[in-house]
Amino acid sequence: MRLYRDNAVVLRQHKLGEADRIVTLLTRQHGLVRAVAKGVRRTKSKFGARLEPFAHIDVQLYPGRNLDIVTQVQTVDAFATDIVDDYSRYTTACAILETAERLAGEERAPAPQLHRLTVGALRAVAEHNRPCELILDAFLLRAMGFAGWAPALDDCARCSAPGPHRAFHVAAGGAVCVHCRPPGAATPSPGVLDLMDALIRGDWASTEDVPESLRGQASGLVAAHLQWHLERQLRTLPLIERARPHAAVRVEDSVRQDGDRDSTTRTSSPA
């Protein structure tokens, strides 16, 4: 089998034996790839540091039966340099990598849009020109769009009645009209769904003056919507809530509920 090259983001790694590591890569053309990096834990390894999480690399691989083998690595962007020493940036970037891996699908299924989105999100976190929670929420919303899970933010998610609508229900698919509104639907403050829509569209100018309270509500709805579809919580989201306690207010505390609260309109508490 022939060697192949691809552009990749290192999602995670773990030890294999005394000197090797298994790395999980999100590649542009081959989707998720798991590969062995031989000897990278040795002091004299020629590319060990280039295979750390958050790295954006150009990699050459040899196809294997179960795991490919890394043969060459060149750094494209060393995002970790500007991420790992800042807790907020680090936890945000970890959530981006975890989400990318969960949404990439089966191994070797091409995911060029998700790859490009992940690289862009890591670059934005490293440059730190915008609040980390907005970068993360924009990434999550767009990534869910690629997976077919984008929440309805204007027209009713159930009957398509023209919006805007005030109620939001995760299990229903997003914004719902007064006729389709199920028990337990949340009523976000005015401007929250507009913020989420601006993040999906990349309209950053519209996000600049949004109060932290509205950003916190939007973050809660985005996280709840993602976790509903994933069917289990991302490990990194509670860490992000601790990193920004004022902005990442839990949904049940920041969004007024009509009727009994239910698990479809809240995020899980940090452990």
UniProtKB/Swiss-Prot annotation:
4Fe-4S keyword on record: no
Domain of life: Bacteria
Stretches for region Disordered: 249-271
Protein name (record): DNA repair protein RecO
Stated family: Belongs to the RecO family.
Taxon lineage: Bacteria, Bacillati, Actinomycetota, Actinomycetes, Mycobacteriales
Keywords, comma-separated and alphabetical: DNA damage, DNA recombination, DNA repair
Signal sequence region: none
Keyword flag DNA repair: yes
Transmembrane segments: none
Organism: Rhodococcus jostii (strain RHA1)
Role of this protein: Involved in DNA repair and RecF pathway recombination.
Single Gene Ontology BP annotation: DNA recombination
Pfam families: RecO_C, RecO_N
GO CC terms of this entry: bacterial nucleoid
InterPro entries: ARFGAP/RecO, DNA_rep/recomb_RecO_N, NA-bd_OB-fold, RecO, RecO_C
GN (gene name): recO
Residue ranges with Basic and acidic residues bias: 249-264
